[in-house]
Amino acid sequence: MTSAEAPDTPFEPKKILAQLPHMPGVYRYYDAAGAVLYVGKARDLKKRVSSYFTKTQLSPRIAMMVTRIARIETTVTRSEAEALLLENNLIKALAPRYNILFRDDKSYPYLKLTSHRFPRMAYYRGAVDKQNQYFGPFPSAWAVRESIQILQRVFQLRTCEDSVFNNRTRPCLLHQIGRCTAPCVGAISAEDYAVDVSNAARFLLGRQSEVMKELEQKMHAFAAELKFEQAAAVRNQMSSLATVLHQQAIEVGSDSDVDILAVVAQGGRVCVNLAMVRGGRHLGDKAYFPTHVESALTLAEGGLGDDTDADAVEAPDVPAEAPVGEPGSARDTTASIEAEVLDAFIAQHYLGNRVPPVLVVSHAPASRDLLELLSEQAGHKVSLVRQPQGQRRAWLSMAEQNAQIALARLLSEQGSQQARTRALAETLGLECDDLATLRIECFDISHTMGEATQASCVVYHHHKMQSGEYRRYNITGITPGDDYAAMRQVLTRRYEKMVEQAAQAAAADDAAGIDGESTRQAEASSLLPNIVLIDGGKGQVEIARQVFTELGLDTSMLVGVAKGEGRKVGLETLVFADGRAPLELGKESAALMLVAQIRDEAHRFAITGMRAKRAKARQTSRLEELEGVGAKRRQRLLARFGGLRGVVAASVEELASVDGISHALAEQIYKQLH
């Protein structure tokens, strides 16, 4: 059930507060523009929402937020647990300004064992299914690949694609170096391979002692039967496993699956360090930095009612510094902040995802309902350990240290980036009241001998690269290798729409009797960057100047980055389109460091896109030209033979064995490819 204050009537809190029930649910605050300010949950909606409007000693910041509330929506739920789940979903979907937000990282890597007769071991990201076996999640791709290398060395499981496996005629190099038992050519039976797969799975689950004991029994059995070669092979396998266990003795504990969560607040930012233990092995950690922290943490500044502890993401402001003090001091405030951030992380990270049976945490969670909901969702009891002992205590201490290191690194990088942004603005003579609003776009053209030409546009805003705003442009209709034409095309496509939108807004304002010129300027400034970097010299900048002149844009924002002698970093020259003399900044210039950083990112983004486009064209172009072969048949051919090279090497009989391809069509395909 949802209730809301009508947006077209003056906001009267008393009216809607009187209608709120004494029931659990979720509430949402909106401003006059319809933007969501905050999403919260409550065990008693009437009591919780009323506290924002009935308390008289609110802090100035909370009072300011309350004055911005133009509409309230509430949703009644059947239980507090249901309210918590709905709150978490709404926070992820709406990203309110005053809620703590963590990046929604759904694609944690897993180690996958496929359901093939000879299962393949593979690195995997994405949704899990019941058909295959999945181990993880792992904190990083490196942790997965390290585990794969260990399993290759000890159990020699295959890692090749099924299409390659089905077409092998002799063992690959991995078999020759003792990293695969070559099931592709029948060098091992399905039964023996299944034993290796089972041992590998138990190893990943932390049951290494069972595996070692069974291998020892197997070795003695072979020796008793005078099968000394087989006994020696098992002995070597035991030796490899013992070596791995010895190398990882420091990180192996009695726990099977545990997550360690440490939170540190400092310098106005918060870091959550998540360390993962799977199968008793410490797999590494990952640092998370929530956004909207300062805004979100203002909401509990004034102690909003007796129901405050029911809301999982409310806490006081993050202070710039947190010195040691008496109870109620900045140190206590920081501890409260860290606990609330931990609640937000647990809710956003684990609800809807796999949860290990044990969470070792640096702070006691504020929400009492969260643990019950996690246990219900996981299908097993989830325990939170606040004061661990032994190995768990060492893991938590290490996680806290890593959180402090990651946070210090972030703050240092932020300070460095802000200094670079300021230096560039001063160098170019830009007047910018808030450097965080300075927007820089950079363009680069990439191709190989005129093939697969692509242009890239990267964006620098709020003192960092904004990868979500990057764009690639496929360049068509030009002479291959003509970088000038490519630059003209991408700049026209990029900014022509922005100019049209500004003109439409100005026309609408004129029709409404508003000063069209001032509105148009405001519209253009919100759409266009402050600086446009062009990876190139005078020729590229001249093309950019022509495009901007045709579009009626200010050419003073155009800056070319010409490479220096020998293309050495630090010798670049800035070239301007408005007649200013070229500028050489020197290797130690903070402004040049920022320009080079943005330029290099544009080049990287263009190169990766160009390579992918070129590889796709080379792999599929000949198959797409085959008569009688559509998309489905082409996919079957690629799946059967592993790629274009395999299709070309196939005989007529092999082609005809593919589902949907007759013998006559196979002959036709063979003739077209040879």
From Swiss-Prot:
<feature type="domain" description="UVR">
    <location>
        <begin position="209"/>
        <end position="244"/>
    </location>
</feature>
<protein>
    <recommendedName>
        <fullName>UvrABC system protein C</fullName>
    </recommendedName>
</protein>
<comment type="function">
    <text>The UvrABC repair system catalyzes the recognition and processing of DNA lesions. UvrC both incises the 5' and 3' sides of the lesion. The N-terminal half is responsible for the 3' incision and the C-terminal half is responsible for the 5' incision.</text>
</comment>
<dbReference type="GO" id="GO:0009380">
    <property type="term" value="C:excinuclease repair complex"/>
</dbReference>
<keyword id="KW-0963">Cytoplasm</keyword>
<dbReference type="Pfam" id="PF14520">
    <property type="entry name" value="HHH_5"/>
</dbReference>
<dbReference type="InterPro" id="IPR001162">
    <property type="entry name" value="UvrC_RNase_H_dom"/>
</dbReference>
<keyword id="KW-0228">DNA excision</keyword>
<dbReference type="GO" id="GO:0006289">
    <property type="term" value="P:nucleotide-excision repair"/>
</dbReference>
<dbReference type="InterPro" id="IPR038476">
    <property type="entry name" value="UvrC_RNase_H_dom_sf"/>
</dbReference>
<dbReference type="GO" id="GO:0005737">
    <property type="term" value="C:cytoplasm"/>
</dbReference>
<dbReference type="InterPro" id="IPR036876">
    <property type="entry name" value="UVR_dom_sf"/>
</dbReference>
<dbReference type="GO" id="GO:0009432">
    <property type="term" value="P:SOS response"/>
</dbReference>
<dbReference type="Pfam" id="PF01541">
    <property type="entry name" value="GIY-YIG"/>
</dbReference>
<feature type="domain" description="GIY-YIG">
    <location>
        <begin position="22"/>
        <end position="100"/>
    </location>
</feature>
<dbReference type="InterPro" id="IPR035901">
    <property type="entry name" value="GIY-YIG_endonuc_sf"/>
</dbReference>
<dbReference type="GO" id="GO:0003677">
    <property type="term" value="F:DNA binding"/>
</dbReference>
<dbReference type="InterPro" id="IPR000305">
    <property type="entry name" value="GIY-YIG_endonuc"/>
</dbReference>
<dbReference type="InterPro" id="IPR003583">
    <property type="entry name" value="Hlx-hairpin-Hlx_DNA-bd_motif"/>
</dbReference>
<keyword id="KW-0742">SOS response</keyword>
<keyword id="KW-0267">Excision nuclease</keyword>
<dbReference type="GO" id="GO:0009381">
    <property type="term" value="F:excinuclease ABC activity"/>
</dbReference>
<dbReference type="InterPro" id="IPR001943">
    <property type="entry name" value="UVR_dom"/>
</dbReference>
<dbReference type="InterPro" id="IPR010994">
    <property type="entry name" value="RuvA_2-like"/>
</dbReference>
<dbReference type="Pfam" id="PF02151">
    <property type="entry name" value="UVR"/>
</dbReference>
<dbReference type="InterPro" id="IPR050066">
    <property type="entry name" value="UvrABC_protein_C"/>
</dbReference>
<dbReference type="Pfam" id="PF22920">
    <property type="entry name" value="UvrC_RNaseH"/>
</dbReference>
<dbReference type="Pfam" id="PF08459">
    <property type="entry name" value="UvrC_RNaseH_dom"/>
</dbReference>
<comment type="similarity">
    <text>Belongs to the UvrC family.</text>
</comment>
<dbReference type="InterPro" id="IPR004791">
    <property type="entry name" value="UvrC"/>
</dbReference>
<keyword id="KW-0234">DNA repair</keyword>
<keyword id="KW-0227">DNA damage</keyword>
<dbReference type="InterPro" id="IPR047296">
    <property type="entry name" value="GIY-YIG_UvrC_Cho"/>
</dbReference>
<comment type="subunit">
    <text>Interacts with UvrB in an incision complex.</text>
</comment>
